[in-house]
């Protein structure tokens, strides 16, 4: 397998400088799409902000930073999955609804 770019994952970690606790994290995963001429699709995942620090624009800053990073690395789009309760937050970050997520979890009997 040939690797066409240096990094696949980019992780943001936000630390409270007073308490030295992690108060937020977010991840960008870059995926090459065969049907898009090996174009890059950015996936934003695991956006988490500690409840004591929510509604302070930390999550929005992380998401906007990852979107900017994805496009600077030539992604043709950025996608993410979220619950219905988080749609408004992501719309404020400039994303819009597109499709329906499907999933199947691995059973616990897997080796």
From Swiss-Prot:
InterPro entries: Acyl_CoA_acyltransferase, GNAT_dom, GNPNAT1-like. The keyword DNA-binding does not apply. It comes from the Eukaryota. One of its GO terms (biological process) is UDP-N-acetylglucosamine biosynthetic process. It is an enzyme of class 2 (transferase). Acetyl-CoA binds at residues 47-49, 55-60, 90-92. Keywords: Acyltransferase, Transferase. CDD domains: NAT_SF (cd04301). Belongs to the acetyltransferase family. GNA1 subfamily. This is Glucosamine 6-phosphate N-acetyltransferase. The lineage of its organism: Eukaryota, Fungi, Dikarya, Ascomycota, Taphrinomycotina.
């Amino acid at each position: 397998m040939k690797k066409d770019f240096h990094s696949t994952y980019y992780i943001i970690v936000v630390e409270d400088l007073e308490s030295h606790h992690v108060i937020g994290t977010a991840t960008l995963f870059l995926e090459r799409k065969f049907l898009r001429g090996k174009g890059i699709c950015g996936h934003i995942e695991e956006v988490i902000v500690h409840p004591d620090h929510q509604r302070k624009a930390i999550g929005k800053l992380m998401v906007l930073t990852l979107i900017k990073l994805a496009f600077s690395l030539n992604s043709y789009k950025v996608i993410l999955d979220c619950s219905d309760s988080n749609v408004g937050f992501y719309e404020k970050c400039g994303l819009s609804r597109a499709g329906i997520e499907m999933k199947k979890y691995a059973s616990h009997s897997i080796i």
